[in-house]
């Protein structure tokens, strides 16, 4: 049996597991679990996408000279008409850079800098973060190798809108939607009940072992960052983590592959959005820029430092902080010369606990801005509609 045959067998097992998950015995479910299923059923998420999936990488490798209509953004959303970071006063601006060694040594300037970054930018880069550079390089290169496998080796891991887990090419289930120019792979690390090696690729041969080590290191880094964010809000160091569910947090990875694009001025690799989760730790492609962060009315192209992570605040931390920390809109541009690979690690709250502004951050002059909502309920928005700027978190602001 060759490696491809092994993958096909594993894939069938995965599909059977997914089918079995749907056949839930209501008699053995708690009210909380029944509520989860009801939420999912109301969303309309099923096992199939609304249209046949076309792999963006396959389109790019077919020597297209023009972009298919499904990927052409409306004029007002095209990067050519909205990018203004080439202006001299903007070109040298970058997101703040935080030295974690210095920060954890008690440097007050760094504490102030990361607090300002969370409040004003929603983004920062971290250096001296404790993750080995060799592991970062191996993670990026191994996933590049995965996307360079024959298409049939990847298709056995095709995902569905129900969980998004696996190999995918679209976000949202709206029929006829204008799509982004990317493929991706999505998988779970935490909770352990969702961590299933059979749903991880088996090729290249080292990918599962490498990915597991990478995930464990990023969970540690996420926990360390949470203590700093919590302290800078005037809370106990552990308090933000406790609001996430303590040790029962969620952690998942989306590996983004952005192929060369024949008309990059008409498309986006990822549409503007803020991340629905708690915190994102991004390993960017440090050879090819692509991430842009909205700062006021300006799109700033992030210049990634080698062996640095890009960290951004998600909607859940904005909610918990009662909007003291900001989840900021960002997008990805593509180019015609080079493909890009980035690894977005999502550090999220436990999916079934209510997330709401921390009581210590609510005052008579700053009442709670958001009603309680579980992360399971919240993230259905992006799973059904795809990236939509800041519209989701803003739609949940409580009326005064």
From Swiss-Prot:
Reactions catalysed, as given in the entry: jasmonate + 2-oxoglutarate + O2 = (1R,2R)-12-hydroxyjasmonate + succinate + CO2
Annotated 2-oxoglutarate binding sites: 256, 258, 340, 342
Residues involved in jasmonate binding: 254, 379, 383
Domain Fe2OG dioxygenase: residue ranges: 248-349
InterPro entries: DIOX_N (IPR026992), IPNS-like_FE2OG_OXY (IPR044861), IPNS-like_sf (IPR027443), Oxoglu/Fe-dep_dioxygenase_dom (IPR005123), Plant_2OG-oxidoreductases (IPR050295)
Domain of life: Eukaryota
Pfam family, one: DIOX_N
One of the GO biological process terms: regulation of defense response to fungus
Enzyme class: oxidoreductase
Gene Ontology molecular function: dioxygenase activity; iron ion binding; jasmonic acid hydrolase
Keywords of the record: Dioxygenase, Iron, Jasmonic acid signaling pathway, Metal-binding, Oxidoreductase, Plant defense
Function according to Swiss-Prot or TrEMBL: 2-oxoglutarate-dependent dioxygenase involved in the oxidation of jasmonate (JA), a stress-induced phytohormone synthesized in response to attack by pathogens and herbivores, which triggers the activation of defense responses via the JA-mediated signaling pathway. Converts JA to 12-hydroxyjasmonate (12OH-JA), an inactive form of JA. Prevents over-accumulation of JA and indirectly its bioactive form JA-Ile under stress response.
Protein name from the UniProt record: Jasmonate-induced oxygenase 1
Organism of this sequence: Arabidopsis thaliana (Mouse-ear cress)
């Amino acid at each position: 049996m060759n490696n491809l045959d092994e993958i096909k067998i594993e894939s069938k097992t995965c599909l059977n597991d997914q089918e079995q998950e749907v056949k839930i015995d209501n008699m053995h479910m708690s009210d909380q679990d029944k509520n989860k299923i009801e939420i999912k059923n109301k969303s309309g998420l099923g096992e199939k996408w609304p249209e046949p999936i076309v792999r963006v990488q396959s389109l790019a490798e077919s020597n297209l000279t023009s972009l298919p209509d499904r990927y052409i953004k409306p004029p007002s959303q095209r990067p050519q008409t909205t990018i203004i970071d080439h202006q001299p006063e903007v070109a040298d601006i970058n997101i703040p850079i935080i030295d974690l060694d210095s920060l954890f040594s008690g440097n007050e300037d760094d504490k102030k800098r990361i607090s300002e970054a969370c409040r004003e930018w929603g983004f920062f880069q971290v250096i001296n973060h404790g993750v080995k550079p060799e592991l970062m390089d191996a993670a990026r290169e191994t996933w590049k190798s995965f996307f360079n496998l024959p298409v049939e080796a990847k298709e056995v891991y095709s995902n569905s809108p129900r969980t998004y887990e696996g190999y995918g090419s679209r976000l949202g289930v709206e029929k006829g939607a204008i799509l982004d120019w990317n493929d991706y792979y999505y998988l779970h690390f935490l909770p352990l009940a969702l961590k299933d090696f059979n749903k991880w690729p088996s090729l290249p041969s080292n990918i599962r072992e490498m990915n597991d080590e990478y995930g464990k290191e990023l969970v540690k880094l996420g926990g360390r960052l949470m203590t700093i964010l919590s302290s800078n809000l005037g809370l106990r160091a552990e308090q933000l983590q406790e609001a996430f569910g303590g040790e029962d947090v969620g952690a998942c990875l989306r590996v983004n592959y952005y192929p060369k694009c024949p008309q990059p001025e008409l498309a986006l690799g990822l549409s503007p959005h803020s991340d629905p989760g708690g915190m994102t730790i991004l390993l960017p492609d440090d050879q090819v820029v692509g991430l842009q962060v909205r700062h006021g009315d300006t799109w700033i192209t992030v210049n990634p430092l080698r062996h640095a992570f890009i960290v951004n605040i998600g909607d859940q931390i904005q909610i918990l902080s009662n909007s003291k920390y900001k989840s900021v809109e960002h997008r990805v541009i593509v180019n015609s010369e080079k493909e890009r690979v980035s690894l977005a690690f999502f550090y999220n709250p436990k999916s079934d606990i209510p997330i709401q502004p921390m009581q210590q951050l609510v005052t008579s002059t700053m009442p709670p801005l958001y009603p309680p909502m579980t992360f399971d309920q919240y993230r259905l928005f992006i799973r059904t509609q795809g990236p939509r700027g800041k519209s989701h978190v803003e739609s949940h602001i409580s009326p005064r």
